[in-house]
Amino acid sequence: MSIFLKNKQFENITSQEQTKNNYKQLINDIQTLKKDLNAIILAHYYQEPDIQDVADFLGDSLGLAREAAKTNADIIVFAGVHFMAETAKILNPEKMVLLPDLNAGCSLADSCPPEIFSEFKKAHSDHLVISYINCSASIKAMSDIICTSANAVDIVNKIPLTQPILFAPDQNLGRYVISKTGRDLLLWPGSCIVHETFSEKKIFEFQSLYPTAEVIAHPECEPTILKHANYIGSTTSLLQYVKNSKKTTFIVITEPGIIHQMKKSCPEKQFLALPTVSGCACNECPHMRLNTLEKLYLAMKTRSPQIEIPESILLNAKKPIERMLEMSN
């Protein structure tokens, strides 16, 4: 081997060691700040693995809302997207809530502009408004009850049959709820860009490659996708399902961040993230992936960016969230 190649190899090893040391130091700094600030890190399953591993609590929207409602921490660092951090602030108006990147929005939340939704609601004033938690604080403030993918079916089932329901903003989750409850819901035409990238073609391809695999999917997917699923559920529900299943191979149809926890829980099993038709990384949420360990550290160090919500919106948005938590207990 030439001296040049040896030197290059040494440089690569040195660089890798430096990166590893920097990573360890970053983790230590985050843990120190967390203790000094009496902070808690809440993270969604769709976050990158490094953030999942440093979180104090990891969960789906319902679990995160419950945790935010009961935390004794002074500062909540929310590793998720904007509407999730807003929910934490609504439940804890006196606490500081930090979001590592304020640009971490949500295509589903953006598909329901408050001004337009307000007019839609007025046109159907006899309807009870049940909104999926994946919406802005302004939409929550116009809602009667909030739901998540984990409890949407149960909540709708608790509403009297004579009461018309307006369900927003996810039409795909709404269609799933209709299929499970038999209710005639009025749906707002919103959707998640990630969960609409999947195709039947790719399901068939993967099923031919892995004939014994079970297909598991999130209810934000389109009906044409869900009809091929052996199991449909929220991220927490999907995780619990693979833990209990006797099957060893799963085709996972949702944002692939959840697979990190599936592999940790069941290292002996195989989890296959269903790709999009184009084969790009479009099944990864671009908003969730804006958060990084470095941004999380900087948010704690600088106490910014903070989530702020006008008091009038905050107070009105809190009622339907609390009603959801009461109905889910």
UniProtKB/Swiss-Prot annotation:
Binds 1 [4Fe-4S] cluster per subunit. It catalyses: iminosuccinate + dihydroxyacetone phosphate = quinolinate + phosphate + 2 H2O + H(+). Keywords: 4Fe-4S, Cyanelle, Iron, Iron-sulfur, Metal-binding, Plastid, Pyridine nucleotide biosynthesis, Transferase. [4Fe-4S] cluster binds at C106, C192, C285. It is found in: Plastid, Cyanelle. InterPro entries: NadA (IPR003473), NadA_sf (IPR036094), Quinolinate_synth_type2 (IPR023066). It is an enzyme of class 2 (transferase). One of its GO terms (cellular component) is cyanelle. It comes from the Eukaryota. Its cofactor is [4Fe-4S] cluster. Pathway: Cofactor biosynthesis; NAD(+) biosynthesis; quinolinate from iminoaspartate: step 1/1. Iminosuccinate binds at H44, S61, Y132, I133, N134, S149, H218, P219, E220, T235. The keyword Transferase applies. One of its GO terms (molecular function) is 4 iron, 4 sulfur cluster binding. GO terms for biological process: 'de novo' NAD biosynthetic process from L-aspartate. The keyword Iron-sulfur applies. Its EC number is 2.5.1.72. Belongs to the quinolinate synthase family. Type 2 subfamily. NCBIfam families: nadA, PRK09375.1-2. Catalyzes the condensation of iminoaspartate with dihydroxyacetone phosphate to form quinolinate. This is Quinolinate synthase. It comes from Cyanophora paradoxa.
